[in-house]
A protein has these predicted regions:
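A generic, well-ordered mixed alpha/beta core segment in the N-terminal half of proteins
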Residues: 173-187
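Acidic active-site catalytic centers that drive phospho-/nucleotidyl reactions
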Residues: 11-13, 116, 178
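Helical "lid/coupling" subdomains associated with nucleotide-phosphate turnover
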Residues: 2-7, 21-26, 45-76, 85-94, ...
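Short, small-residue-rich loop/turn micro-motifs
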Residues: 34-42, 202-204
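Short, glycine/acidic-enriched loop or turn micro-motifs at the edges of active sites
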Residues: 14, 181, 261
Length: 360
C-alpha cells in the first residue's frame, strides 16, 4: 500500500485564490482532494495604480487565512503558496506579502515566470486518480464550495484528457496554455519536462480594466483590445510563436491543453451548463470555432446578462470577455484547432511540490 501524505497548494493569482488540499501517494499521484476557488481579485485596480489596494489586500488576507486554517484542521503535513503576476509587479509587493504571511501563518512565495510555468505544467499534466476528500470544510467564507473531481473512466482511472499521464502511459509532449487574471503563460513541453515557456502581459483583469470601459463593450474598445493582444503575441521572445506554430499543425498531432479560470469558464459556457461542474468541464475539447463564438457572444451581452449565465457569476462575468478574446486570438494566431480543457494547473503543481519535500 502506497503511503499517503496530505498537503496543500495555494495559487494566489491576480483574480482568484485557488486552493487544493490533496492526499498524495508515494508515486506522486493525487488520490483524493478538496478544491476551492475564491474570486478575491487581488489585482483589482493594479493596472491603473501599480499597487495592490487596501480593499483587495483585506479581501485576500481574510480568505487566505480561512483557507490555511481549514488546511491545518484537515491535517495537512505541508503547505506551499505561489503568488503570480500581481505580486511580481505591484510596487507595494513587500508590504502585501507581509500582511498575507501574517494572515496565512506561512511564507508567501512570489514565483518567477519560469517557476510559474513549471508548476502549471506539472499540475496540468499530473496523474489524477482522484476522489473527493470526505471532510467538510468548516470556517470557509460565503460562496465557497468544494469542486467535484473528474469522472472515473473504465478501470477506475480518472479521466484526464489529452496531454496528461493516464495509468502507466507517460505524457510524451505537448503545449499548455494558461490564461490568467494578470498574464497568459505558454508552455512547450516534452516527456522529460518543459522545453521552453513564455509569460505574456495578457490577463483577463488587467485588459478588462484597461480597454473595456462600456457595458456592453463598444466596438472600438473590442478592436483596441484585439489589436493589443495581437501586438503582444507578436512580441513573444522566449517562446517565439513563429517557431511554435509548426508544432501545432494538425499533422504534428501535438496535444494542446488549456488551464485557468478563463479557459474552464469558456468550456462551461460552450457546454451550456446551468452551473459550473468540473466533471463536465474536465477533458472537454473546445474547438477554435467554439471559442470564437463564445467570445463574440459574451462581447454582445451587457454585464447583467452575462451574470445570468450560471457558470460565470458576477466576478467572472466582469472579466469573461477579455479572457475569451485572449484565448480566441491566441488559437487563431497559432492555428490551434482544438484545446483540451484541464481543471488542474498551478495549485496542483504546488501541492505536488509540497509532497515531494515533506516536513522534517
Amino acid at each position: 500500500m502506497a503511503s499517503i501524505q496530505r498537503v496543500a497548494g495555494f495559487d494566489i493569482g491576480t483574480n482568484s485564490l485557488r486552493v487544493l488540499i490533496a492526499d498524495v501517494d508515494s508515486l506522486s499521484r493525487i488520490v483524493a482532494g478538496l478544491r476551492l476557488g475564491f474570486a478575491v481579485r487581488l489585482g483589482e485596480g493594479l493596472s491603473e495604480t501599480g499597487r495592490v489596494s487596501e480593499t483587495a489586500l483585506e479581501r485576500t488576507s481574510r480568505v487566505l487565512g480561512k483557507s490555511t486554517l481549514l488546511a491545518r484542521r484537515l491535517g495537512t503535513s505541508r503547505m506551499l503558496t505561489g503568488a503570480t503576476h500581481a505580486l511580481r509587479v505591484a510596487t507595494n509587493s513587500a508590504e502585501v506579502v507581509n500582511d498575507l504571511e501574517e494572515a496565512a501563518g506561512l511564507p508567501i512565495n512570489i514565483l518567477t515566470p519560469e517557476e510559474e510555468a513549471y508548476y502549471i505544467y506539472t499540475g496540468a499534466l499530473s496523474d489524477s486518480f482522484f476522489t473527493a476528500l470526505p471532510n467538510a470544510f468548516p470556517g470557509a467564507s460565503p460562496g465557497t464550495s468544494p469542486v467535484a473531481p473528474p469522472p472515473a473512466s473504465p478501470g477506475g482511472v480518472a479521466s484526464t484528457g489529452a496531454g496528461a499521464t493516464v495509468g502507466e502511459r507517460a505524457f510524451e509532449g505537448g503545449f499548455v496554455i494558461d490564461v490568467g487574471g494578470g498574464s497568459t503563460t505558454l508552455i512547450e513541453g516534452s516527456g522529460t519536462g518543459i522545453v521552453r515557456s513564455s509569460t505574456l502581459p495578457l490577463g483577463c483583469v488587467t485588459l478588462t480594466e484597461r480597454f473595456l470601459k462600456h457595458d456592453p463593450p463598444a466596438s472600438e474598445e473590442l478592436r483596441a483590445l484585439g489589436d493589443h493582444i495581437m501586438t503582444e503575441l507578436s512580441r513573444a521572445q522566449s517562446l517565439p510563436l513563429s517557431q511554435v506554430r509548426p508544432l501545432l499543425l494538425p499533422e504534428a498531432q501535438v496535444p494542446v491543453t488549456g488551464v485557468g479560470g478563463a479557459v474552464t469558464s469558456i468550456a462551461a459556457v460552450s457546454l451550456g451548463l446551468p452551473y459550473y461542474e468540473s466533471r463536465r468541464v474536465e477533458g472537454h475539447i473546445l474547438t477554435r470555432d467554439e471559442i470564437e463564438h463564445c467570445a463574440q457572444q459574451l462581447s454582445r451581452l451587457p454585464l447583467e446578462e452575462r451574470e445570468k449565465i450560471g457558470t460565470l457569476g458576477r466576478r467572472r462575468a466582469e472579466i469573461a470577455v477579455a479572457g475569451a478574446f485572449i484565448l480566441s486570438l491566441l488559437t487563431c494566431h497559432l492555428n490551434v484547432r482544438r484545446v483540451t480543457v484541464s481543471t488542474r494547473g498551478l495549485r496542483y503543481g504546488l501541492a505536488l511540490e509540497a509532497a515531494a519535500h515533506p516536513a522534517g
